[in-house]
């Protein structure tokens, strides 16, 4: 296969190609508390031993190259190299293995998700000796996570800002996502917020198009926010999408949102990039703005089981880069998401300390120390009949977001919002009274619909709507 390198200058320079495993496969290595640990699912090409493949991953994502080079003798590769310290076969899969790799902390720039990913996944995924490669999980040691600011505010600060406790927050993505004028867009925002939602949202691809320029949208949305707040006595928000073609333009939009008095802005963190996202997160913390994160493009990276990167890794990276909310699937809606796997990365977003649990896809114990948590957002193909399951699955520290499930109500946007708010309040009350949402959920919704005509109408419209497909990314 490919190479390796001498690790000590004293051994002298010997030109040529060596097996990677001679230097980078170290099964006796004792991992350090400061190492970044990675779990890769790898499928070697036929004839490539798994030890050689794992060592190649460690080498090509750290100090190695395809041949021995003279300048190896000018540094200490034993100090800086990545090490494949364990390999295990994947149960039920032919020629698939989990390779565990440890990276010394000094390989990475402090506070830079961009640099971390450039090193760990930047080049090795195109390596010919591997048929497929997927990064399943990372362990971020406190020594590295403490170099990141993390979420601008976090869950508790957001609740204090909104003065809303003891229940999930309710949101709605304005539809149709493209084509509305700024004034009609603002009207839809007002109707949804007046009806009882906490948030409305720009869709991920609403930026600044000819039919609705960003400044016009921001102005009409701000008017809707203040009017709905005055009428309901509740603090309201709309995720104003600041994503733009340049970082400078993105910051200009965030600044204008703050000047209007908006409480929250939004960013598409994968299409916008981690450098832009971290810059925006710093601005939001300094200026009191909450930051909603959309994961547009994630399925290009994470949906295939054998190649790419699992969303739990992208979720950890987002927590480090900065965001107060991030979309996390629904389990029950139209988007991909198996329950145990989803709850695994939801805990990685919210909790301070998460134990290793392979049944939920968590390969390493993760200690975030004091880094604030991120609210998971359940969005995509959900409606009032899903409310009991969503409340039971995601708990209070979440945002439940109904787009079509609000704006598709037969009586209009405000009644759609009323239906969702009534359904949520009924589920929270039933849970607090000790009722089993998983078993009694439909009964709880039916009981609430008897005194809410808006909910009754919603129940009738969506009584047969289900998204029953097999999940691709399973454990």
UniProtKB/Swiss-Prot annotation:
Main location group: plastid
Broadest EC class assigned to this enzyme: lyase
Post-translational modification: The disulfide bond which can form in the large chain dimeric partners within the hexadecamer appears to be associated with oxidative stress and protein turnover.
In-chain residues carrying the UniProt-annotated modification N6,N6,N6-trimethyllysine: 14
Keyword Magnesium: yes
Example of a GO cellular component annotation carried by this entry: chloroplast
InterPro entries with a match to the protein in the record: RuBisCO, RuBisCo_large_chain_AS, RuBisCO_lsu_C, RuBisCO_lsu_C_sf, RuBisCO_lsu_fd_N, RuBisCO_lsu_N_sf, RuBisCO_lsuI
EC number: 4.1.1.39
Residues with the N-acetylproline modification: 3
Positions of Mg(2+) binding: 201, 203-204
Alphabetical keyword list: Acetylation, Calvin cycle, Carbon dioxide fixation, Chloroplast, Disulfide bond, Lyase, Magnesium, Metal-binding, Methylation, Monooxygenase, Oxidoreductase, Photorespiration, Photosynthesis, Plastid
Catalytic activity: 2 (2R)-3-phosphoglycerate + 2 H(+) = D-ribulose 1,5-bisphosphate + CO2 + H2O; D-ribulose 1,5-bisphosphate + O2 = 2-phosphoglycolate + (2R)-3-phosphoglycerate + 2 H(+)
Cofactor info, note text: Binds 1 Mg(2+) ion per subunit.
Active site, per annotation: 175, 294
Protein residues bound to substrate: 123, 173, 177, 295, 327, 379
Pro-peptide positions on chain: 1-2
UniProt-listed SUPFAM superfamilies: RuBisCo, C-terminal domain, RuBisCO, large subunit, small (N-terminal) domain
Localization annotation: Plastid, Chloroplast
UniProt-listed CDD domains: RuBisCO_large_I (cd08212)
Site (Transition state stabilizer): 334
HAMAP family, A to Z: RuBisCO_L_type1
Family: Belongs to the RuBisCO large chain family. Type I subfamily.
Complex and partners: Heterohexadecamer of 8 large chains and 8 small chains; disulfide-linked. The disulfide link is formed within the large subunit homodimers.
Additional free-text comment from the UniProt record: The basic functional RuBisCO is composed of a large chain homodimer in a 'head-to-tail' conformation. In form I RuBisCO this homodimer is arranged in a barrel-like tetramer with the small subunits forming a tetrameric 'cap' on each end of the 'barrel'.
Name of the protein: Ribulose bisphosphate carboxylase large chain
Native source organism of the sequence: Psilotum nudum
Lineage of the organism: Eukaryota, Viridiplantae, Streptophyta, Embryophyta, Tracheophyta
